Amino acid sequence: MPEKYYQVGKIVNTHGIRGEVRVIATTDFTEERFKKGTHLAVEMPNGLTPVTVSAMRQHKQFYLLQFEGLGNINDVELFKGHNLKIAASERDDQLEDDEYYYGDIIGLEVIEESDGTSYGKVSEIIDPGPNDVWVIKRRGRSDLLLPFLKSVIKKIDIEAGKAYVEVPEGLIDNED
C-alpha cells in the first residue's frame, strides 16, 4: 500500500532568482513542517517530486522555502501552482485525543446524531476567528457552515469516515 501524503501548503510563485518558492501554508505546524531538513513532495501532474527544505523564512503572509540542490529560479519555476505535501511517516508531532489534522477531517461524511440524516461531506475548514468552521458541501443546496465546538461536533470517527453532529436550531435554512 502506498504511503499517504498530506497537503501542507501551495507553491504560489517563485521569489527572487536563487530558487526560493513562495508558499501559502495549509498547516498549523509551519515551523515543524518547513524547518531545514524536512522531506516534502511537490504534487506534479506526473506524480510526487521529492524535495528537502534547505532554508525557510517568513515574508508577509507567505513562507519562502528553498530546497536542497535547487538553487536557481529555473529549477523551481515548474513548481508554481502545485501543492506541497508531507508523508504521513514524516509527521512526528503528537496530537491530543480531541485534536485532528485538517486532512483527516476533510472528506468526512457529516451525520445528524439524533436521526442519522447525512448533511454531506466536509470540503474545507476555514479559520475565521476563535474556532474553526467546517464547510459542508450539500447536494443541490448551499454549503452548511458548522463551528468546531463540542456542543455541535459530537463524535469524530476517522476510521469510519464519519462525523456525528448536533446542528443548532436555525442554522439550516429550509431550502426545499
Swiss-Prot record:
Predominant subcellular localization, coarse grouping: cytoplasm
Domain PRC barrel: 97-171
Keywords (A to Z) from UniProt: Chaperone, Cytoplasm, Ribosome biogenesis, rRNA processing
Subcellular location: Cytoplasm
Entry-linked Pfam families: PRC, RimM
MF-aspect GO terms: ribosome binding
GO biological process: ribosomal small subunit biogenesis; rRNA processing
Protein origin, superkingdom: Bacteria
GO cellular component: cytoplasm; ribosome
InterPro entries linked to this entry: PRC-brl_dom, PRC_barrel-like_sf, RimM, RimM_N, RimM_N_sf, Transl_B-barrel_sf
Gene3D superfamilies cross-referenced by the UniProt entry: PRC-barrel domain, RimM
Family annotation (SUPFAM superfamilies): PRC-barrel domain, Translation proteins
Function: An accessory protein needed during the final step in the assembly of 30S ribosomal subunit, possibly for assembly of the head region. Essential for efficient processing of 16S rRNA. May be needed both before and after RbfA during the maturation of 16S rRNA. It has affinity for free ribosomal 30S subunits but not for 70S ribosomes.
Assembly: Binds ribosomal protein uS19.
Family: Belongs to the RimM family.
Domain comment in the entry: The PRC barrel domain binds ribosomal protein uS19.
UniProt protein name: Ribosome maturation factor RimM
